[in-house]
Amino acid sequence: MPGGDRTGPWGQGPRTGRRAGFCSGYRMPGFMNRSVWPPFGGRWFRWFGRRFWGRRAGRAGRGRWW
């Protein structure tokens, strides 16, 4: 809700963004709402945790960023 006019980030109506702010019934703005974090329903570390990066680093060898 960039302009505070309850139209969402794309200007197409309420709840067209992350559904985390006043338009969804929360009492605080979206950036302060802790109920939307972590993303992906709590499966954040499945992709960005040790398992994923550990496998990639094992294939690429040491000294590479990916």
Swiss-Prot record:
InterPro entries: DUF5320. Residues 1-21 are annotated as: Disordered. Pfam families: DUF5320. This is Uncharacterized protein AF_2391.
